[in-house]
């Protein structure tokens, strides 16, 4: 899968995209990340890619012309489905369902908003899919692009060393992940649950499902409102509710 990222600050991506899972995926040719410096598409000697807003106000606005040239150039080199995504606080909040949907395309063209945002004509010309990573303020769309690329890349076959990791991640199946443990068995009088040491894979799987439902019920009950549960999951959820009530009463 290809990611074309239009940005004023390509150096912001060096660390996140050259290490860990993303770095390995790039080395193996599973994903390709193309960083496009918007300033390379300016025409004046100062490489001006932003300007003061009409009507006054604080901050600067990213100019439409260099973004148009950069995006048009990228599109001319790509074949297939390449939706244009604008990282913006005004966009749809990124969640796992959206991540899965985005991963089905041949690639994505990402525009990283910065300063006070992009000239409105970028939206009018390209009608991008606007995506936000949450209701809070960060330095620029570059941070959102890093999150999006990481999340989408995990959906691509072969990127994860063990495909089970993808399925067991929080949110992949609409609920939170179950608790994880490793050695030692006991630390500061805190013990690993006996079931995980039993070797009984059926019991372990059942325990993990119930713990995932229990954790979701405690921390993110909203996720369960529209979640379609299997009969087994419904039974485990009732058991989890009883356990929570018992812990509360104790």
Curated annotation (Swiss-Prot):
It is found in: Cytoplasm. GO terms for biological process: tRNA N1-guanine methylation. Pfam families: tRNA_m1G_MT (PF01746). It catalyses: guanosine(37) in tRNA + S-adenosyl-L-methionine = N(1)-methylguanosine(37) in tRNA + S-adenosyl-L-homocysteine + H(+). Keywords: Cytoplasm, Methyltransferase, S-adenosyl-L-methionine, Transferase, tRNA processing. One of its GO terms (cellular component) is cytosol. Its EC number is 2.1.1.228. S-adenosyl-L-methionine binds at residues 113, 133-138. GO terms for molecular function: tRNA (guanine(37)-N1)-methyltransferase activity. The keyword S-adenosyl-L-methionine applies. Homodimer. PANTHER family: TRNA (GUANINE-N(1)-)-METHYLTRANSFERASE. Specifically methylates guanosine-37 in various tRNAs. Belongs to the RNA methyltransferase TrmD family. This is tRNA (guanine-N(1)-)-methyltransferase. It comes from Halothermothrix orenii (strain H 168 / OCM 544 / DSM 9562).
């Amino acid at each position: 899968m290809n990611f074309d990222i239009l940005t004023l600050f390509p150096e912001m991506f060096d660390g996140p995209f050259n290490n860990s899972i993303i770095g390995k995926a790039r080395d193996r040719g599973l994903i390709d990340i193309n960083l496009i410096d918007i300033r390379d598409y300016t025409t004046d000697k100062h490489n001006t890619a932003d300007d003061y807003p009409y009507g006054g106000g604080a901050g600067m606005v990213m100019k439409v012309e260099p973004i148009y040239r950069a995006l048009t150039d990228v599109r001319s080199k790509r074949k297939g489905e390449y939706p244009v995504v604008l990282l913006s606080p005004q966009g749809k909040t990124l969640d796992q369902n959206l991540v899965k949907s985005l991963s089905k395309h041949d690639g994505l063209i990402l525009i990283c908003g910065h300063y006070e945002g992009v000239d409105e004509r970028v939206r009018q010309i390209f009608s991008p899919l606007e995506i936000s990573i949450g209701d809070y303020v960060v330095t620029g769309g570059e941070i959102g692009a890093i999150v999006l690329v990481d999340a989408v890349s995990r959906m691509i076959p072969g990127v994860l060393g063990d495909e089970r990791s993808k399925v067991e991640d929080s949110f992949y199946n609409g609920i939170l992940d179950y608790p994880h443990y490793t050695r030692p068995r006991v630390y500061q009088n805190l013990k690993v649950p006996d079931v995980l040491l039993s070797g009984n894979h059926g019991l372990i799987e059942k325990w993990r499902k119930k713990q995932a439902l229990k954790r979701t019920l405690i921390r993110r009950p909203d996720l369960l409102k529209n979640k379609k549960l299997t009969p087994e999951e419904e039974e485990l959820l009732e058991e989890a509710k009883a356990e929570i009530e018992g812990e509360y009463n104790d």
